[in-house]
Amino acid sequence: MHRSIAFLPLIALLACSPQSGTMHATEDQPTAAAGMIEDYTQTPVHIWEAEPERQSLGQLAYRGGLHIEHTDERFGGWSALEIDQDGTRLLAVSDSAYWMSAQLEWSDNGWLSGIEGIEITPLLGREGQELVGDEEDSEAIAHLGGSRYAVSFERNHRINGYDLGADHSGIHDAVGIALRLPPGAVDLPNNGGLEGMTAFDGDNILIGREYPPQDGAPYLLYYYDGQDWSDVRVASLPGFAVTSLTRYGDHIYMLERFYTQEDGTRIRIVRFPLESLAAGSLIEAELLGALEAANPVDNFEGISVIEHNGETTIVIVSDDNYNAYGNQRSLFLAFALED
């Protein structure tokens, strides 16, 4: 299948390269193998592990969580998350350049109850090739509208665009198209690149670098308003980093992560008004909830916000680093924002 590019009005972000004209593998390009995974386990988790009846977390009300386990070496490392606005279809990318497409199941009272139909597919490069080595570290997804998505990568810092087709039907052979990086992004640290990304209002895109220029300094986000790039500064706490961004309604939602060997992992879910992007002043984000030692805390790197069961529902996913350290999990947690 051969398709012409359809990223308008984000066409201004397209890199000028002769390879940038198709979004699906042609007959001369290999189509990578994909596969449904079966026999995985789903274990419910409590938000307060020592107090199973407790459901509140700051301004958030818990709406269920799952620990997903599978022996397939492709499963894990989930670093970004997008959920359709009806709350049923999930799309994720991993540190090893795989897509995951799946269906979310919810109980009648709005609790996350299961993940079914998990399919894992290689995420392809700009020549239709499978990605390996420093090319494979996919970190963020932004939904560009329709069936089009952008994916950011670190180590070899770049952004690719993909057309996945209706209901992700073209995910198996979607070829990356080069999108233009924000100014200076190519010089970011090897393992500290474009960690969060969200697109909105047709031609606006917001991208977050993982670490502030100096510890405790404001986070630096790159904002494209349809015409120009500008820097956005968001106040940070010492030791924290940006791991994900998403827009919902009139707010930007952001995940922050803290980790040291001595103190372990902490996660903050925050938000700030969309209109503050154009203000030019330092943004002070609103803390919605924080995960610490008493909670099922892990390396959460993906966030998506939807309207579900009449509530603003936040879903986060953790990157278990393929459990290389023996104590990490692939967790999917859901929360409702309490008014």
Per-range role (PLM):
Residues A6-A15:
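Bacterial N-terminal signal peptides
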